[in-house]
Regions:
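A short glycine-rich, Lys/Arg-flanked "PGG" loop and its adjoining helix->strand segment in the class I
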Residues: 156-168
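A short acidic, Gly/Pro-enriched loop at the edge of an enzyme's catalytic core
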Residues: 130-138
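Conserved class I S-adenosyl-L-methionine
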Residues: 2, 6-7, 11-71
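A short SAM/SAH-binding and catalytic strip from SAM-dependent methyltransferases
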Residues: 137-153
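C-terminal lobe and adjacent flexible extensions of AdoMet/dcAdoMet transferase-like proteins
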Residues: 235-278
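Class I SAM-dependent methyltransferase SAM/SAH-binding core
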Residues: 82-128
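SAM-dependent methyltransferase
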Residues: 171-239
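Class I SAM-dependent methyltransferase "Motif I" SAM/SAH-binding loop
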Residues: 77-81
């Protein structure tokens, strides 16, 4: 597995996912870099389906940011660039970051194909302010990405780094899969939001309180897997509050009102509201 502090581009040379002899025992935060091998990254947009996802989300994130007067945005989990591109097209000043070099490269190429030049950087959230300078109006962490942090110490450290990178009145937007419903009632999905590709399936292969192992199956019969931590909604809200964030508002599938077990995904919007100006 490539080390976070070692070769920054090691995963670009990886051809296959490798979970060793006991995949369910692989529960380390640093594993995400080895999971997103280039062959998986190249297929990621089939899973998302940019057009369908844009239709399902509508103007949600654009409206949230505009309503609060936010302009300078840090996308800390840019993936293949979907949200960075949508926000750039809407006129926001976007910096796009990801811990995985293959994702950063793909995001840049996707933007270039749309006549946009992304400001990209490879950055691990746990050392975010080492790799990215300046303060931002908003940080977005989307695509169920926060779930890649397997240790609580890493979650707290990442939230502290997000807090430090925001301006005094900045906001943080984090989304997550509805793991509460999966843990308590089993898996079901409307397949309407986030992973909108209708030829691709994404479903849990194994779930316990400390691991959600998802399998992604593509039309060419290729399969990939991700080991993630099943974040409960109120647990993440508690971590955000303890990191200093206030007025945390949670949406279910982009709606303000919802039944707890119904949404496929939650979106948390929180404010820094530090009394001291920069």
């Amino acid at each position: 597995m490539p080390e976070t502090t070692g070769d920054q581009n090691a995963e670009l040379r990886l051809k296959h996912q490798d979970y060793g002899s006991d995949p369910l025992a692989v529960r380390e935060t640093g594993q995400y870099r080895a999971e997103y091998v280039m062959s998986f990254v190249e297929k990621w947009d089939e899973l998302i389906d940019w057009r369908a996802r844009a239709e399902s989300e509508g103007q949600f994130f654009i409206d949230v940011l505009r309503a609060r007067g936010k302009v300078k945005i840090l996308d800390v989990a840019c993936g293949t660039g979907f949200h960075s591109v949508q926000l750039m097209k809407a006129g926001f000043d976007v910096t796009s970051a990801d811990g995985n070099a293959a994702m950063v490269a793909k995001a840049f190429d996707n933007a270039k194909d749309r006549d946009l030049i992304l400001k990209t950087v490879q950055a691990d959230w746990r050392w975010l302010n080492r790799d990215i300078s300046g303060k931002f109006d908003a940080i977005i962490c989307l695509g169920n990405s926060f779930t890649h942090l397997h240790e609580e110490a890493d979650r707290r450290r990442a939230l502290a780094e997000f807090y430090a990178a925001l301006k005094h009145d900045g906001i943080l937007i984090i989304d997550q899969r509805n793991y509460d419903a999966i843990l308590d009632h089993g898996f079901s999905s409307k397949h309407k939001y986030y992973y909108c590709g209708d030829q691709v399936t994404a479903e849990p292969e194994y779930v316990d309180d400390g691991l959600a192992r998802f399998k992604y199956s593509f039309p060419d019969n290729s399969e990939f897997r991700l080991n993630m931590f099943p974040l409960r909604k109120n647990y993440l809200r508690k971590l955000m509050s303890e990191a200093g964030f206030q007025h945390i508002h949670t949406y279910g599938d982009f709606q303000e009102t919802y039944q707890e077990s119904e949404p496929d995904f939650f979106v948390h919007v929180a404010e820094k509201l530090h009394p001291e100006a920069n």
